[in-house]
């Protein structure tokens, strides 16, 4: 039986909200998309909630209402563009906006007011996907490897899927064993933060600014000494660890570097932590499929190909899947799994004690 779902994803980059319409039968098919750029004031509010501050509970409650109303408007626009009505959609899978991710302390917080979203859209909402996995002893992240497995597993071995959003995570796909996956470290988060602080630009288009600089080995080695990179998976991370303050901490006591050299070094950090993670976890990788915003960073993609000479590095576009929409598709699929009672976490990815059905349901 065919079902229609809507997936909503707002990632750690805080640049915008992705809304995807999915047709789900024996496979997942992307039918339409809608993108909402994050308003500057809401971006600032959400970024502020990622670290300790004053009156956080009230600020979070207000911010999530703004976020939710934006999403509801986007869902309405998407449906109108497709000449569809809410009754045709089985559910919205809403990730919400992560403001804290501390699995070692037993919590991950996503705001988004799914009750209000169900009320505004008149569509059942499935949300709160991470906490059940954490309750079962897992990291609560990454959750997309199970979807990567469903989408890209065609019984070929030695394939990996790399998502480069604010943070980078890998899914390792082999035909004879369960999918494995983990966070590698910063994806775009430090690159975006640095160029925003130095040039007041939202991101480094094509990695051109990074390509204009030189990698500083002293800084690179200091960055690579972080405990996260020395820890074996399952593991996940977030802005609590990797942020602009973390960069400034490591720049302290180093000779003055040009801003573009810092950017080049941050790009090298992203590329190295991805390739080293991949090589240590999967002896042979014939094919690396890249999705997320980082797939458009030409300098980063070029560097990954250089570091992985025996691996074909390409965008998920090769499979006819737009790299910008894989995560939003994943949360539509996770909503489907929840309503069907299908466990969607992978203990080989998160470290949970077992398979669990993920998500909380807010009926229309």
Curated annotation (Swiss-Prot):
InterPro entries in UniProt: Anhydro_N_Ac-Mur_kinase, ATPase_NBD
Keywords for this protein: ATP-binding, Carbohydrate metabolism, Kinase, Nucleotide-binding, Transferase
GO MF term list: ATP binding; kinase activity; phosphotransferase activity, alcohol group as acceptor
Keyword Lyase part of the UniProt annotation: no
Function: Catalyzes the specific phosphorylation of 1,6-anhydro-N-acetylmuramic acid (anhMurNAc) with the simultaneous cleavage of the 1,6-anhydro ring, generating MurNAc-6-P. Is required for the utilization of anhMurNAc either imported from the medium or derived from its own cell wall murein, and thus plays a role in cell wall recycling.
Family to which the UniProt record says this protein belongs: Belongs to the anhydro-N-acetylmuramic acid kinase family.
Residues holding ATP: 11-18
Catalysed reactions, semicolon-separated: 1,6-anhydro-N-acetyl-beta-muramate + ATP + H2O = N-acetyl-D-muramate 6-phosphate + ADP + H(+)
Single Gene Ontology BP annotation: amino sugar metabolic process
A Pfam family this chain is assigned to: AnmK
Keyword Amino-acid biosynthesis: no
Pathway(s) the chain acts in: Amino-sugar metabolism; 1,6-anhydro-N-acetylmuramate degradation; Cell wall biogenesis; peptidoglycan recycling
Protein name (database record): Anhydro-N-acetylmuramic acid kinase
Organism: Pseudomonas savastanoi pv. phaseolicola (strain 1448A / Race 6) (Pseudomonas syringae pv. phaseolicola (strain 1448A / Race 6))
HAMAP family (alphabetical): AnhMurNAc_kinase (MF_01270)
Stretches assigned to coiled coil: none
């Amino acid at each position: 039986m065919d079902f229609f779902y809507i997936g909503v994803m707002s990632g750690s980059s805080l640049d915008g909200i992705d809304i995807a319409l999915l047709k789900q039968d024996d496979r997942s098919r992307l039918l339409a998309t809608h993108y909402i750029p994050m308003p500057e004031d809401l971006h600032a509010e959400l970024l502020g909630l990622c670290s300790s501050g004053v009156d956080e509970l009230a600020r979070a409650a207000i911010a999530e209402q703004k976020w939710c109303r934006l999403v509801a408007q986007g869902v309405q626009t998407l449906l109108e563009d497709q000449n569809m009505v809410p009754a045709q959609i089985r559910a919205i899978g809403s990730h919400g906006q992560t403001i804290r991710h501390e699995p070692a302390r037993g919590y991950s917080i996503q705001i988004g007011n799914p009750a209000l979203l169900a009320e505004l859209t008149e569509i059942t909402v499935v949300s709160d996907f991470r906490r059940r996995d954490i309750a079962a002893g897992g990291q609560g992240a990454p959750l997309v490897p199970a979807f990567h497995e469903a989408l890209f597993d065609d019984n070929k071995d030695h394939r990996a899927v790399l998502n480069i959003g604010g943070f980078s995570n890998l899914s390792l796909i082999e035909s004879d064993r369960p999918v494995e996956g983990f966070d590698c470290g910063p994806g775009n988060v430090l690159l975006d933060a640095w160029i925003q602080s130095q040039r007041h630009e939202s991101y480094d288009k094509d990695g051109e600014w990074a390509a204009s600089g030189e990698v500083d080995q002293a800084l690179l080695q200091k960055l690579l000494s972080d405990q996260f990179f020395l820890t074996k998976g399952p593991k996940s991370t977030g802005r609590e660890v990797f942020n602009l303050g973390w960069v400034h901490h490591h720049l302290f006591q180093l000779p003055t570097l040009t801003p573009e050299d810092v950017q080049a070094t941050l790009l090298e950090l992203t590329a190295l932590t991805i390739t080293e993670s991949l090589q240590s976890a999967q002896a042979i990788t014939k094919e690396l499929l890249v999705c997320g915003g980082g797939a458009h960073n030409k300098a980063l993609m070029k560097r990954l190909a250089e570091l992985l000479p025996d691996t074909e590095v390409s965008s998920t576009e090769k499979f006819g899947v737009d790299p910008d929409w894989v995560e939003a598709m994943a949360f539509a699929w996770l909503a489907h799994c929840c309503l069907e009672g299908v466990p969607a976490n992978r203990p080989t990815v998160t470290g949970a004690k077992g398979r669990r059905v993920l998500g909380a349901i807010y009926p229309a």
